[in-house]
């Protein structure tokens, strides 16, 4: 039997209550995902990501207890290249600090996975999920499980090699962009349950808002490559790089495409100039929305994105000039996530809420 699409003004009080509960569940997942990314950023900035050298999805929940277990964990760390080449003078107490960062990152990952899976099962078993959104909600725990596997795949890249003291920048960037995709997806889903006071925008505005989210994700991806190659700790001047607007050595690697992923100078250059490009696109977008839907909530959101981009650019410059201190690095990452989430909210709000299904 074909589904009948209804107008949302015919939603029953029970359907509205169910939607509100699902939305709260999705927002809880979103908050945990944001926390995981920030703890992951701290884990990276403190060099803690390789402190746990194995992956035990169940038993790994329990940290070392007592001096003997701590010493055993420390001995495992002493077998990898990061300890041998960088941290030979590390004490057990110093090891505990980096261990706790990585442990917290993994625990948060398990928590969000359980929240997503158990929440989905409960809403499905109690028949609170409408047919047209069941598949979308099912994708959430699948993506989170996939992200957990990517996380270990990333860590493994820095453990199995005798000459590597950090994880692969390719895998780090993939890990972060997958997390950002999950954040984008969950934000988009959760906002779809909101009844908007503003009418939907036209299709051109909707598409422009969607492409803006794509551009923000690209900028975050190159930011991850900057982090993976420690490119923020070189060429710490602005607006020039090494005394030049377009520095020498941008294409020094062969083949040329390798510079986009392995040349710190090129990657920092792209991250800088893509930020300028993104700023101009957000301005164009804001005026375009204002022209099409003047003095609307949509246009106000579009202009606020411009403000957020300016703040983020200022933070990026200060972080670069100060050679990426941990605090500023985390603030820069936090604002990037805020821009992403708000841009997704703006994009989703240009459309109508999920329609009721009979």
From Swiss-Prot:
Q: Where does heme bind?
A: 271, 332
Q: What is catalysed by this protein?
A: Fe(II)-heme o + 2 A + H2O = Fe(II)-heme a + 2 AH2
What are the subcellular locations of this protein?
Answer: Cell membrane
Which cofactor(s) are needed, names only? heme b
Does rRNA-binding show up as a keyword for this record? no
Enzyme type, top EC level = oxidoreductase
Please give the GO cellular component terms listed in this UniProt entry.
plasma membrane
Q: Which residues cross the membrane?
A: 22-42, 107-127, 139-159, 173-193, 208-228, 269-289, 302-322, 324-344
User: GO biological process annotations for this chain's record?
Assistant: heme A biosynthetic process
Q: How does it sit in the membrane?
A: Multi-pass membrane protein
Q: Where is the signal peptide?
A: none
Q: List the keywords (alphabetical).
A: Cell membrane, Heme biosynthesis, Iron, Membrane, Metal-binding, Oxidoreductase, Transmembrane, Transmembrane helix
Family, according to the entry, reads as follows: Belongs to the COX15/CtaA family. Type 2 subfamily.
Q: Which HAMAP family match?
A: HemeA_synth_type2
What does this protein do, in the record's words?
A: Catalyzes the conversion of heme O to heme A by two successive hydroxylations of the methyl group at C8. The first hydroxylation forms heme I, the second hydroxylation results in an unstable dihydroxymethyl group, which spontaneously dehydrates, resulting in the formyl group of heme A.
Protein name as it appears in the record: Heme A synthase
Annotated organism of origin: Bartonella quintana (strain Toulouse) (Rochalimaea quintana)
């Amino acid at each position: 039997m074909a589904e009948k699409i209804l107008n949302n003004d015919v939603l029953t009080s029970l359907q509205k209550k169910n939607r509100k509960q699902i939305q709260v569940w999705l927002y809880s997942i979103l908050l945990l995902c944001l926390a995981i990314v920030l703890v992951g950023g701290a884990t990276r900035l403190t060099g803690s990501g390789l402190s746990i050298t194995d992956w035990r999805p169940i038993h790994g929940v329990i940290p070392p207890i007592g001096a003997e277990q701590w010493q055993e964990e420390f001995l495992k760390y002493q077998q990898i290249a990061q300890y041998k080449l960088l941290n030979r003078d590390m004490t057990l107490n110093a090891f505990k600090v980096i261990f706790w960062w990585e442990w917290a990152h993994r625990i948060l990952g398990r928590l969000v996975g359980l929240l997503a899976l158990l929440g989905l099962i409960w809403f499905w078993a109690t028949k609170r999920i409408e047919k047209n959104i069941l598949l979308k909600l099912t994708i959430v725990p699948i993506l989170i499980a996939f992200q957990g596997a990517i996380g270990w795949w990333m860590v493994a890249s820095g453990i199995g090699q005798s000459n590597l003291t950090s994880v692969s920048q390719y895998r780090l960037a993939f890990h972060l962009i997958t997390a950002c995709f999950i954040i984008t997806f969950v934000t988009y889903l959760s906002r779809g349950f909101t009844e908007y006071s503003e009418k939907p925008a036209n299709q051109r505005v909707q598409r422009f808002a969607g492409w803006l989210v794509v551009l923000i994700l690209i900028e975050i991806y190159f930011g991850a490559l900057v982090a993976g190659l420690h490119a923020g700790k070189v060429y710490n001047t602005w607006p020039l790089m090494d005394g030049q607007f377009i520095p020498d050595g941008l294409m020094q690697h062969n083949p040329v495409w390798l510079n986009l992923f392995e040349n710190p100078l090129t990657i920092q250059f792209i991250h800088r100039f893509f930020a300028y490009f993104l700023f101009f696109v957000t301005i164009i977008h804001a005026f375009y929305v204002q022209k099409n839907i003047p003095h609307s909530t949509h246009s106000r959101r579009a202009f606020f994105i411009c403000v957020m981009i300016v703040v983020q650019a200022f933070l990026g410059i200060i972080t670069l000039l100060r050679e990426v201190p941990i605090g500023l690095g985390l603030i820069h990452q936090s604002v990037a996530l805020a821009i992403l989430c708000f841009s997704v909210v703006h994009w989703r709000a240009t459309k109508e809420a999920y329609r009721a299904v009979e």
